[in-house]
């Protein structure tokens, strides 16, 4: 167990995906509109607590779901959460299953990604007038925080949720869904699920020295599976509505556990990795 001072240093950012951005999970909610060097985040930051753990909720696509995946300001979102003092970011995301055993309604605690995006800034060090100075070559062998993932996995087991302890997610540009040929190719690559938002979010969190973990909720079998209805907006929303309480339950139980743990070494290692990955400009 952590000491009292260590506990107060933990603040959890929650980025809610499609159907999973309900602010009601927070107690004592207040709204805070912020700006960043990269522009405005997707919406107001919702500040509050989950069982005495400070939390900040952000709707990835905006509270009215008006921002498509390619247009989400991922840089501003992560920057804003970092500036607000978040040590951790736990995100939820809808995804399509590429594996028979990952059924609609199942959760996957992602451990790897494949990037198929093409239009999104992936670094805070992008050479723009507002960017940090230098060039960052952040290691990505372990994109997601293993310690945070382990807490999510163990909590899901205790809650009796259908949850897969690892999975590789392929992030596509969107907003369209995959073709059948693409879906079949992703399977041969070893991908387990497909979505539109994990990259560059996870990369930017790593650059920011934040413990980042993702709860992926399978809503469908994408379109690779014969004799199965292909993914559709209606189907995704229906499954998310039916299963949103599972993700809420996992967050509400996991976050107090995270708040009771010692994170100083983990956070120090992440900070050092981020710092030593930057090549400063020559003078």
From Swiss-Prot:
Task: Give the EC number.
Answer: 2.4.2.28
Which superkingdom, per the lineage?
Eukaryota
Q: In which pathway is this protein known to take part?
A: Amino-acid biosynthesis; L-methionine biosynthesis via salvage pathway; S-methyl-5-thio-alpha-D-ribose 1-phosphate from S-methyl-5'-thioadenosine (phosphorylase route): step 1/1
* Site feature: Important for substrate specificity: 178, 233
Q: Which enzyme class, named as a word?
A: transferase
Q: Which reaction does it catalyse?
A: S-methyl-5'-thioadenosine + phosphate = 5-(methylsulfanyl)-alpha-D-ribose 1-phosphate + adenine
Q: Which residues bind phosphate?
A: 18, 60-61, 93-94, 197
Q: Mind listing the GO biological process terms from this record?
A: L-methionine salvage from methylthioadenosine; methylation; purine ribonucleoside salvage
What Pfam family is a match for this entry? PNP_UDP_1
Keywords in UniProt for this one? Acetylation, Cytoplasm, Glycosyltransferase, Nucleus, Purine salvage, Transferase
Spell out the InterPro entries in the cross-references: MTAP, Nucleoside_phosphorylase_d, Nucleoside_phosphorylase_sf, Purine_phosphorylase-2_CS
| Residues recorded as bearing N6-acetyllysine in the entry | 51
Compartments (UniProt record):
Cytoplasm; Nucleus
Q: Which GO terms describe its molecular function?
A: S-methyl-5-thioadenosine phosphorylase activity
Key word Electron transport present: no
Q: Name one GO cellular component term.
A: cytosol
Instruction: Give me the residues that bind substrate, please.
Output: 196, 220-222
Membership in a protein family: Belongs to the PNP/MTAP phosphorylase family. MTAP subfamily.
How it assembles, according to the record, is: Homotrimer.
What is its biological role?
Answer: Catalyzes the reversible phosphorylation of S-methyl-5'-thioadenosine (MTA) to adenine and 5-methylthioribose-1-phosphate. Involved in the breakdown of MTA, a major by-product of polyamine biosynthesis. Responsible for the first step in the methionine salvage pathway after MTA has been generated from S-adenosylmethionine. Has broad substrate specificity with 6-aminopurine nucleosides as preferred substrates.
This protein is called S-methyl-5'-thioadenosine phosphorylase
Write down the species. Mus musculus (Mouse)
């Amino acid at each position: 167990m952590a000491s009292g001072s260590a506990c107060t240093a933990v603040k959890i950012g929650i980025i809610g995906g499609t159907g999973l951005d309900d602010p009601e999970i927070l107690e004592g909610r207040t709204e805070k509109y912020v700006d960043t060097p990269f522009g405005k985040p997707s919406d107001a930051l919702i500040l509050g607590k989950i069982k005495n753990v400070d939390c900040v909720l952000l709707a990835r696509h905006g509270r009215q779901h008006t921002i498509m995946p390619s247009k989400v300001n991922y840089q501003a979102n992560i920057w804003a959460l970092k500036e607000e003092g978040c040590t951790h970011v736990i995100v939820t995301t809808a995804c399509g299953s590429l594996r028979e055993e990952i059924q609609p309604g199942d959760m996957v605690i992602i451990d790897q990604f494949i990037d198929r995006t093409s239009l999104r800034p992936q670094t805070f060090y992008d050479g723009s007038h507002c960017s940090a100075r230098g060039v960052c070559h952040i290691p990505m062998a372990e994109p997601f925080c293993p310690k945070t993932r382990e807490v999510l996995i163990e909590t899901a087991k205790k809650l009796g949720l259908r949850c897969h302890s690892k999975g590789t997610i392929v992030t596509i540009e969107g907003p369209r869904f995959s073709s059948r040929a693409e879906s079949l190719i992703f399977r041969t690559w070893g991908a387990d699920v497909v979505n539109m938002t994990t990259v560059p979010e996870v990369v930017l969190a790593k650059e920011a020295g934040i413990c980042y973990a993702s709860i992926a909720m399978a809503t469908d079998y994408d379109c690779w599976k014969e004799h199965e209805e292909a993914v559709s907006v209606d189907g995704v929303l229906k499954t998310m509505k039916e299963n949103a309480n599972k993700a809420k339950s996992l967050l509400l139980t996991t976050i107090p556990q995270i708040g009771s743990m010692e994170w100083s070494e983990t956070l120090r290692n992440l900070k050092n990795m981020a710092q030593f990955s930057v090549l400063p400009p020559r003078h």
